[in-house]
Amino acid sequence: SDKKQEGNHMADYSKMKPEEVRELIRKGEITIPTAGMCGGYAQANLVILPKTYADDFREFARKNPKPCPILEIMEGSPEVHDMGEGANLVTDIPKYFIYKNGVKVDEVTDASAYWEDDFVGFLIGCSFSFEEALLKEGIDVRHISMGCNVPMYKSNIQCQPAGVFEGPTVVSMRPMTPENAKKAYEITERYPNVHGCPVHMGDPAEIGIKDIAKPDYGDPVEIREGEIPVFWACGVTPQAAVENAKPPIVITHAPGHMFITD
């Protein structure tokens, strides 16, 4: 199973170079969430959409830099330039979601068949990028220690709308002691390109989350006695906006399954 595969190899993947892991992903040998892989390298969320929607989406990202920090834009070709040498947007992510008219219609490990020449791809910063820094400070990152995907929730924090795109900010959650939460705030503040500091700490209901045990994306994680949930803006936010805007086709990463940059 995925979980077992994860436990066996996660330690090996954490020390590997991004191009090595991307090659294993391209060959279909890694199909699990990428948290904890290639420690110290930024990871990215993906949104690919038809050119006619690209300007609205670029504007949506510009107006919402916390959940949607753009790292690179690829027009007309899935080949990546700055973020990963020799990398390809449609083969180098472990799992993709395909949306048609706002509805998820497919999950694939290779999205080449869906690519069209008038598509534009956006790589957006991901909070997995700063987890290495948290681990170095001795902060337990629960989804890594549990070997599962990070829990993600649609919040009641609304994004600034742009063109056809609007929707809630999706947040990722990591439980920790209040003392570690303060440390995590100070650490992640230094990473504005990958969501920066938390958007909320404590009571999930305050940001519209009814049941912390039922994430909208990813897996639930254990919150231990004396811990509080800490929430960061999350790059799955565009997927919620896509569900509202309903473009004819959109390719995204599957939540938790990231593009690992150089």
Where are these regions (language model features)?
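Short, Lys/Arg-enriched N-terminal segments with co-localized hydrophobic residues
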Residues: 1-9
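Residue-identity detector for glutamine
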Residues: 4-5, 43, 158-160, 239
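A polyampholytic, Gly/Pro-enriched intrinsically disordered region
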Residues: 164-168
